[in-house]
Amino acid sequence: MKRTGAWTAVRALEALGIRYTFGIPGVHNTELYDELNSSGQITPVLVTHEGGAAFMADGVSRTSEQTGTLVIVPAAGVTHAASGIGEAFLDGVPMLVICGGIRSDLDKRYQLHELDQHAFIRPLTKAAFLVTSHAEIAPTLFKAWEIAHSGEPGPVFVEIPVNLQMFPGEVGEIPSPPVIARPQRAPAGAIRHAAEMLFAARHPGLFIGWGARDAVAQTRAIAEFLQAPVATTL
């Protein structure tokens, strides 16, 4: 079937369970925002600066089961969002960064917002993708989501050229979204060693990362037993 890239992208985000996106509409992502506006599941949250959007997306990932998602314009939108994307990268917080791109069907240089943004954003993300066809859109977004949540989490960047968003092209059925396996239990020897170190410490303390967000009761029990102060990365 033939669908616009914007339609395909939003259907993929719905399949991933995304409920909110953050960003600013512009020349290179208006079609995405038109589709988001018609979604019965996703609410696009508009901001006055992409930096704020990135920190909002970071906060969503930290405090809920949702994946914080940006929808931004290329070049200036990417550089403005970089501080929040970098924060998520350093703290191991999953994030989807969906960026419009210049037209890939024109043999023209110096288009509006033309920038080698992959060279710019690659050091701040786990991976960066440039979509080259309509059929790639949903699988690429699913792959980005999977990478964002696998291993040490972090942001992943996906650029969708505006011509793919605007014009219809051949796409298959939206595939089933990926499922991330829960982390395996740490080896018993490592747990025993950590407990021995805590017992041996004269002034034990707990520095809790985002990965312990589902272990609140256990963390409190350990802290109370050790009478240890607790600090978090949140």
Mark where each language-model region is:
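N-terminal alpha/beta PP-like core and its mobile active-site loop of ThDP/TPP-dependent enzymes
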Residues: 1-234
